[in-house]
Structure formats: structure tokens, C-alpha cells
């Protein structure tokens, strides 16, 4: 069997590494570089990848694709995609399934299909170095990638001819690269990963015990639409706006000019990491009736920092939240690892150092650490690297919608993966023959406030009173963070499952907003949950009371029956409202009005010589009421 290579599939640049003896080695590509631009160009005769594609971008802007990772697993209508449409020189289009695809020379291409070209280049680079075929890989993704984005990355690997043995989170890979072989007994590190298109922060504990190293992710967070591209776009907008003020010409309408400005903006940003100012000179950038126009602009480091300071500040806010989730204080962090090319910016380094009160490590290559870590994980899977245990986490809570529109969480965020969790639910109606399992992801109590990942039906449930059938719902997250959900009728053994494949996955802004909303609305969520619990109790008591009235028959006087039915009707009316206290008061009223019912039941029991029945319960022990839709045949 050949080696398992490690690939950092980046937004801006990609990198490939492999275990060489007991160390991971980054492999140079055909151009002699250790990283490859994640750029793909389609010409009349061939497909170019990497530096050759980048060199011809100015003359072929509409067919030169970059930052495709920002589109992977996203819907066309999403805010992030709509924002990118305005600034990308190539055409982003809506696929038949609603995904964001790219139109190249009249053909619609899916992001995994395009990303596969970069992976093919990485595969060929490794094969040239090793002198043998490569078929297996570990590929890294941002820690905050959702299920759809992870699956799309696996699809890209398949298209490239690779068996993706593991998807590993980028900060975790960087921690592996940093900590492998360390003799320190116990250390907690923060990995701040600001790449070309994504941002991640992970708090990771590295333990050494009896010769075995354990890398345990305590918490993770980030933004899958924040990175160097966004920094570049701020500079691009500034250059274009300044030129428009001077010449009254908007370069955004000229794809070739826009590509030249993009290259100049990226170059200026990089130069300002070591210089205090730089000149942007683009002669013959465009022309009008008066003749050719030239662009000349001086940009200072201070100006650049003013343009992007809010982006850096937002990353620090994510850092605070993840530290809180990890249950760690700033003083408990032993080392800070900076990963991703954008961390070379002095402002980023300064703000991170100010937050932690110490400088980040300088001995970790931000462009190569992730690929090295992926290669180490490949070595672990292959058995070449021993005594290393990696414990990663899922970034968001997972659950299903239950009675009253509540999200019942089965797996909490920052749970170590792989993991499996089951819970028993039941039906909400008598003789319900089918249920719909609605799978959710998020941190809010109200189901509608979370992200829907998909739904499926479990049919063929035997007719039974509500609350009697036992439906076991199981969530299973594998080591790649990919989700499987199943539902099983414990009475009949019938089972249905779904592998969550909806490409309308969570956006970074939705994820962050969910967490922020959950914190800001904790009190509102608590009150909502209490009202729902009261409603569910009211519903159960109303159902049980009506059943007892029917069973009592003529043994119950007309006056008592009317009194009880009136109390039940008032309870049902109260349950439609938002007043928990009123619902509870009406529950007490029904219980009081139902005393004659208990007397009738006791009399019947005594006549039959049986035991006195206990008051009916709205719930069976260990069974959670769940409101499922009944699936009806349309015949």
C-alpha cells in the first residue's frame, strides 16, 4: 500500500506533505514552490492550475477561477455568495439544485469539481516526489465547516481520484504539526488560523502520558467567510473608489481592469507587512474618449490598517467566545500558534499579542503547518506514527424538533467526535402511523430559530394511543464530522435513516448569529421553553381527562360532565396563549373539576375488586413527547 498524503486545500494557496521517516515533509511542486496558488484557468486548449493559471489571469479574467473554497457547499441565494458575485470577475450562477456554481465558457461547474483540479495537482506533485501512485489522502477543512461543506470536500477528493481517509480541522492539524514529539507534560495552546478565505480559532490541550500524546480540542469557533480575500477586497474597493473620484470611471465594470487591481491590491497588502508605504502603479488601466487612463496611488500601512481593523476586531471577538467555551482564561494558554498567510500582517500579530499578553510562536510556518499536520494524521492512520491520539469536536449542537416547536438537543456543541447519541421520543396523536424527523443544527430553544439540515419519514407505526409508541432517534457523527441520523420504532423494529447531504448548509454568519442570539436571548429562550412545557402538560391532561369522561359514561352526572368539559375547554384556550401562570392555573382547575371522575373510577375499581387506579400521567417515563407530522397517502 502507498502512503497517505496530507493536503491543505486552501482558499488562496494549497500545500501537500507526506511522512518521510518519522517527520513530515512538504513537497515542492513542478514550479519548485512549496505552496501552489488555488487558482484554476480554463483556456481554449487546456486547464491550468497554480502559478501558470495565475500568470494569465489578467488576460483571461472570466475563465480564471480563484477562492472557490468560499463557494463550496453554499447556496446561490446565500448572503456570502451574493456578496462575492459583485466582486468576482468570473460568473457565479445558480445550479438546478440551488447551489452556487460557476459558469465557464457556457458550462456550469460545481465547486467540488473545480477544487478537484487543485487536488489533482497536489496528487501529481506527491506522485512525482514519491515515484509511485497515490490514492489516499487526509484533507483539511476549516473547523467551522458545516456538514455540506465537509461532504463537498470529500466529493472533490473523489473527483480527483483520491480516497479521502479523513477530513481533519485545520487548527487541529496545525496543533499536530506543532506538538508532535514535544516532551512537555501538559500544555494548552490556542491556534489562530486566518487564511485566505476562512478564520478558525481552536483551544487544544496536548497531554503526554506514558509515552502517548493526546491532542484534545476543548472548543472551536470561527467564520468560514473571513480571510485574506476580505482584506484584499477592502484594498480593492479603496483603490477603485479613489480612481473613480479622480477620473469618474468605475473599474468594477471592466473585468480585465478589475483583475489587474486585484493583483495590485494583494501585492500592496503583502508589501505593507514589511514597509510603511507602497505605490500602486497601473498604467493604461482603462480609457475613455479623452484617451488612456493611468492609476497611481500611494497606500500607507496606517491606511491599510484603518481599512481592515474591524475584520481583525471580529476575529478577536470569536477568540473571546471560544476561550469561554473551553473554560480557559488567557493566563492558562501556554502557546499561541498563528496559521494562515494573513497572520503575517503586523496588525493581526499585534492584536493577538495584546489579547493574550504574550507574543505568538514564531517557529511555526503559517503556510505549511496545516499540511504537515494532515500528513502526520495520515501517518497515524497508516500506522507509521504511533502513540498519538487526536480528539476533535463538533462546532454546533444537533437535535430534532419536538412538541411545541422546541429543539431537543441530542449532541451539544464542542462534543468530542466521533460520537453517537440516542433518545426515545413518542407520538403526539392517537393512532399516528408515521412521523417526520426534522433534523436541526444550532443553539436556540425555538426550532424555527435554528438551521434545518433535512427531514425524513418513519412510516408503518402500529396504531396505538399517543405516547405509547417508542421512537428511538440516533445521531451518529463520524470522525470527519459528517452526520447520520436514524429513527427506529422499537415495537416493530422498522428503521429509517438519513445521511445529511443538504448543500444548503450553515453559513458562518448564521452560526455566529445563532450563538450570539442564544446568549443574548437566554432569558427569552428559558421563558419560551417553560411555556412550551406548560402547554405540553396541558395538552396531556386535556387528552387524558376527555378519555376518562368517555370511559365513565353514564356513571358521571350531566352537571359534573359539563363542569369538567368547560374546565378542559378553558385550559385548551389558555394553552394557545403565552401566559405560563394562566395555563398552570387552568391545569389546577381541571384537576379540581375532575374529582368526580376519580370517584367514579374508584367506585368501578371497588366493584370489580381491583386496585384503585392512579391518576393518568400525560407522559410515559423516559419518553419525551414529540410533535411529528402525520404522513398521509395522497391516493
Swiss-Prot record:
Gene3D superfamilies: 1.20.1270.10, 3.30.420.40, Actin, Chain A, domain 4, Substrate Binding Domain Of DNAk, Chain A, domain 1
Region (Disordered): 602-635
Disulfide bonds: none
Keyword Chaperone: yes
InterPro entries according to UniProt: ATPase_NBD (IPR043129), Chaperone_DnaK (IPR012725), Heat_shock_70_CS (IPR018181), HSP70_C_sf (IPR029048), HSP70_peptide-bd_sf (IPR029047), Hsp_70_fam (IPR013126)
PROSITE patterns: HSP70_1 (PS00297), HSP70_2 (PS00329), HSP70_3 (PS01036)
Keyword terms of this UniProt record: ATP-binding, Chaperone, Nucleotide-binding, Phosphoprotein, Stress response
Modified residue annotations for Phosphothreonine: 198
Gene Ontology molecular function: ATP binding; ATP-dependent protein folding chaperone; unfolded protein binding
Compositionally biased residues, Low complexity: 602-617
Factors inducing expression: By stress conditions e.g. heat shock.
Cited Pfam families: HSP70
Family, similarity comment: Belongs to the heat shock protein 70 family.
Described function: Acts as a chaperone.
This protein's name: Chaperone protein DnaK
Organism listed in the record: Haemophilus influenzae (strain PittEE)
Gene symbol of the encoding locus: dnaK
Amino acid at each position: 500500500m502507498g502512503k497517505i498524503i496530507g493536503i491543505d486545500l486552501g482558499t488562496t494557496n494549497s500545500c501537500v506533505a507526506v511522512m518521510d521517516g518519522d517527520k513530515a515533509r512538504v513537497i515542492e511542486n513542478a514550479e519548485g514552490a512549496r505552496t501552489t496558488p488555488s487558482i484554476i484557468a480554463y483556456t481554449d486548449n487546456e486547464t491550468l492550475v497554480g502559478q501558470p493559471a495565475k500568470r494569465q489571469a489578467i488576460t483571461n479574467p472570466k475563465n480564471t477561477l480563484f477562492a472557490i473554497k468560499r463557494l463550496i457547499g453554499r447556496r446561490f441565494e446565500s448572503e456570502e455568495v451574493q456578496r462575492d458575485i459583485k466582486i468576482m470577475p468570473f460568473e457565479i450562477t445558480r445550479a438546478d439544485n440551488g447551489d452556487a456554481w460557476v459558469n465557464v465558457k457556457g458550462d456550469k461547474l460545481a465547486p467540488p469539481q473545480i477544487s478537484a483540479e487543485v487536488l489533482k495537482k497536489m496528487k501529481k506533485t506527491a506522485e512525482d516526489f514519491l515515484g509511485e501512485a497515490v490514492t489516499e489522502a487526509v484533507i483539511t477543512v476549516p473547523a467551522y465547516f458545516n456538514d455540506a461543506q465537509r461532504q463537498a470536500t470529500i466529493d472533490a477528493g473523489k473527483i480527483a481520484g483520491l480516497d479521502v481517509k479523513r477530513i481533519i480541522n485545520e487548527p487541529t492539524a496545525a496543533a499536530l504539526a506543532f506538538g508532535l514529539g514535544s516532551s512537555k507534560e501538559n500544555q494548552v495552546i490556542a491556534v489562530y488560523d486566518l487564511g485566505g478565505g476562512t478564520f478558525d480559532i481552536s483551544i487544544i490541550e496536548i497531554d503526554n502520558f506514558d509515552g502517548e500524546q493526546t491532542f484534545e480540542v476543548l472548543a472551536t469557533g470561527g467564520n468560514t467567510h473571513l480571510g485574506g480575500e476580505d482584506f484584499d477586497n477592502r484594498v480593492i474597493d479603496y483603490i477603485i473608489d479613489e480612481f473613480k473620484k479622480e477620473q469618474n470611471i468605475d473599474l468594477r465594470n471592466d473585468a480585465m481592469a478589475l483583475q489587474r487591481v486585484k493583483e495590485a491590491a494583494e501585492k500592496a497588502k503583502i508589501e505593507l507587512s514589511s514597509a510603511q508605504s507602497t505605490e500602486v502603479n497601473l498604467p493604461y488601466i482603462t480609457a475613455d474618449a479623452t484617451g488612456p487612463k493611468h492609476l497611481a496611488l500611494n497606500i500607507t500601512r496606517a491606511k491599510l490598517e484603518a481599512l481592515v481593523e474591524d475584520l481583525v476586531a471580529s476575529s478577536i471577538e470569536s477568540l473571546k467566545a471560544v476561550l469561554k467555551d473551553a473554560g480557559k482564561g488567557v493566563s492558562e494558554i501556554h502557546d499561541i500558534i498563528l496559521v494562515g498567510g494573513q497572520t503575517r500582517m503586523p496588525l493581526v500579530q499585534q492584536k493577538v499579542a495584546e489579547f493574550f499578553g504574550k507574543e505568538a510562536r514564531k517557529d511555526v510556518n503559517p503556510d505549511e503547518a496545516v499540511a504537515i499536520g494532515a500528513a502526520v494524521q495520515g501517518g497515524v492512520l497508516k500506522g507509521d506514527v504511533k502513540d498519538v491520539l487526536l480528539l476533535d469536536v463538533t462546532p454546533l449542537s444537533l437535535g430534532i424538533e419536538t412538541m411545541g416547536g422546541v429543539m431537543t438537543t441530542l449532541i451539544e456543541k464542542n462534543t468530542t467526535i466521533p460520537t453517537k447519541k440516542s433518545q426515545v421520543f413518542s407520538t403526539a396523536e392517537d393512532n399516528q402511523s408515521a412521523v417526520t424527523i426534522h433534523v436541526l443544527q444550532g443553539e436556540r430553544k425555538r426550532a424555527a430559530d435554528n438551521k434545518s439540515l433535512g427531514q425524513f419519514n418513519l412510516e408503518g407505526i402500529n396504531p396505538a394511543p399517543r405516547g405509547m409508541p417508542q421512537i428511538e432517534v440516533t445521531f451518529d457523527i463520524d470522525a470527519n464530522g459528517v452526520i447520520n441520523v436514524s429513527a427506529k420504532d422499537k415495537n416493530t423494529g422498522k428503521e429509517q435513516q438519513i445521511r445529511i447531504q443538504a448543500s444548503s448548509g450553515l453559513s458562518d454568519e448564521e452560526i455566529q448569529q445563532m450563538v450570539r442570539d442564544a446568549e443574548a436571548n437566554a432569558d427569552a429562550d428559558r421563558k419560551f421553553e417553560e411555556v412550551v412545557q406548560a402547554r405540553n402538560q396541558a395538552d396531556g391532561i386535556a387528552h387524558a381527562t376527555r378519555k376518562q369522561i368517555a370511559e365513565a359514561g353514564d356513571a358521571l352526572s350531566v352537571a359534573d360532565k359539563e363542569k369538567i368539559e368547560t374546565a378542559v375547554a378553558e385550559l385548551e384556550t389558555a394553552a394557545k396563549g403565552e401566559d405560563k401562570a394562566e395555563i398552570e392555573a387552568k391545569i389546577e382547575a381541571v384537576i379540581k373539576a375532575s374529582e368526580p371522575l376519580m370517584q367514579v373510577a374508584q367506585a368501578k375499581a371497588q366493584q370489580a375488586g381491583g386496585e384503585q387506579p392512579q391518576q393518568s400521567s400525560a407522559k410515559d417515563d423516559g419518553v419525551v413527547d414529540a410533535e411529528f407530522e402525520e404522513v398521509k397517502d395522497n391516493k
